[in-house]
A protein has these predicted regions:
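Active-site-adjacent helical/loop segments in soluble small-molecule enzymes
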Residues: 51-108
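Glycine-rich phosphate/pyrophosphate-binding loop at beta-loop-alpha junctions
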Residues: 1-60, 101, 106-124
Length: 124
């Protein structure tokens, strides 16, 4: 929300695990839904149901939601560790996984990826 308020023309893309598409499916349904199950190692990205406030904020400020699999997040976390010494958990490496897998077209523009979480589930 803050980034969009500062620069309204930026494109914000959310990333979720294939095995826990809570926001992705809620957006498609146009309302908050509850998943029957989640199947991902990225635990902090795996709620069965989101809160209405989160849903509303995503509807307003996130331009697109994309899905990445656990293996892609694992590879991204390993890359961050071995190349930069950054210990990111799988959830924190999700945006790098999306960029690495070229899940969406970035084109010739600046890209900012938020990397968070200092868990060790992504480090071999």
């Amino acid at each position: 929300a803050a980034a969009k308020n500062i620069k309204p023309n930026i494109r914000v893309i959310g990333v979720e695990p294939v095995g826990a598409p809570t926001h992705f499916q809620s957006r498609a349904a146009g309302k908050v839904i509850k998943l029957d199950k989640v199947d991902t190692r990225a635990g902090t990205l795996a709620p069965k149901k989101t809160e209405i406030l989160n849903f509303e904020l995503i509807q307003e400020y996130v331009d697109d939601l994309i899905l990445v699999d656990d293996m892609s997040m694992q590879k991204a976390a390993e890359w961050l560790w071995f190349e930069f010494g950054v210990a990111a958990e799988l959830s924190g490496a999700a945006s790098i996984a999306a960029l690495s897998d070229k899940v969406f077209e970035t084109g010739p523009r600046n890209v900012c990826s938020i990397i968070c979480g200092s868990g060790t589930d992504g480090i071999p």
